[in-house]
Amino acid sequence: MKKNPIKSGLRETMAGKVTFLFLLFLYTGVMLYLFWMECYQVPGFQSDMPDYVNKVAGIAGNYEFPYPILFWTARLSAWLIGAKAAMAITTALFNLAAVVITKYYMNREIRKVSHYDDLTQGRQAMTDILVTLLVFSLFLLSNLYSPKNTAFFGFDYAYRCMGIYTPNPFWNATYLATRPFAIICFFETVKVLSEYQRNFQWKNCTLFAVSLLLTTMTKPSFTMVVVPLI
């Protein structure tokens, strides 16, 4: 009997669920604090958030952002809690969604290549916890790729905000907002490329196409990099 891939990605031991939810709560709380400080321009928390807040509030700023998803979403609550709080919370929610989506796809892929169902409950729990730790490690390490005192295009930018030269993407909310869609797009691209020559069906491209569209509408530069690779 063929397994449902959606259920395979969602099913998890209680120990695995508790570990993931605890780390997700902790991670999201820390990120929300960071985004809140950035949106309210607390000294020492430089970012592009002030320009994003102005966009949500309808105030003309120094830049135009022709990719609307993040700003549309933030405006849903801005009328009630203000543009600054709305942008901070919206960015945190997109960041949370990226972690949840990555965890789902990692679970699904692990179950494809391992005999998960044949493991004892203890080993299943250990597998779930290891996958969770791997997911959070990926999200943390993706922001720490630059060694200290490394120069890039002539800039010694370690631990400082230097606009597009900053190694830490937490300063850029549009990048964070596109990650949920980009992660879906990545895994669905792998699926389409692995199946299109032997069992291609147009309906299997739906999620790939939608995620690519949403990614482009959230951060077009992602598409400029990914589409040529495909």
Language model regions located:
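Transmembrane-helix motifs of polytopic, lipid-linked glycan transferases
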Residues: 89-118, 184
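Membrane-interface alpha helices of multi-pass inner-membrane proteins
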Residues: 204-226
